[in-house]
A protein has these predicted regions:
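Conserved N-terminal entry element of GNAT/NAT acetyltransferase domains
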Residues: 1-14
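Conserved beta-hairpin
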Residues: 16, 21-36
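Conserved acetyl-CoA binding element of GNAT-fold acetyltransferases
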Residues: 45-56
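Conserved acetyl-CoA-binding loop-helix of GNAT-fold acetyltransferases
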Residues: 54, 60-73
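Conserved GNAT acetyl-CoA-binding A-motif
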Residues: 73-86
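Conserved catalytic-core motifs of GNAT/GCN5-like acyltransferases
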Residues: 79-81, 97-108
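Conserved active-site tyrosine of GNAT-family acetyltransferases
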Residues: 91, 96
Length: 108
């Protein structure tokens, strides 16, 4: 499934692969070039983000924010699980609040 999330920016959901664990993977592409990926878990009651990785040469362009904005439009409850210390300002900036030391939550 390809979903446009910004000018030239697409989020592409990949099929689950058991050898990669029980995760839903998304590629982030800009004009057909992969610029990052997201590792999530989609469940009926919640959507969990384990990581959003934008490749270093593409950082600072708002791509991670565009991914989160899309997820926020689609899901009423999002958990950012295993948030690293250096990533906390990003999650706070996009509207998440800390529930525990490494888990941030966004609710509609």
């Amino acid at each position: 499934m390809n979903v446009p999330i910004g000018p030239g920016l697409e989020l592409i959901q990949r099929p689950r692969r058991p050898e990669l664990g029980d995760y839903d993977w998304f590629d982030v592409e800009l004009d057909g070039t992969q610029v990052g990926k997201a590792r999530c878990r989609i469940e009926p009651a919640q959507f969990t983000v384990f990581s959003i990785m934008i490749y270093p040469e593409f950082e600072g362009n708002g791509f991670a924010r565009a991914v989160i904005d899309h997820f926020q439009r689609e899901h009423p409850l999002i958990i950012a699980d295993r948030v690293r210390f250096l990533a906390r300002p990003f999650w706070t900036k996009v509207g998440f609040v800390a529930e525990t030391i490494d888990r941030y939550v966004w609710r509609r």
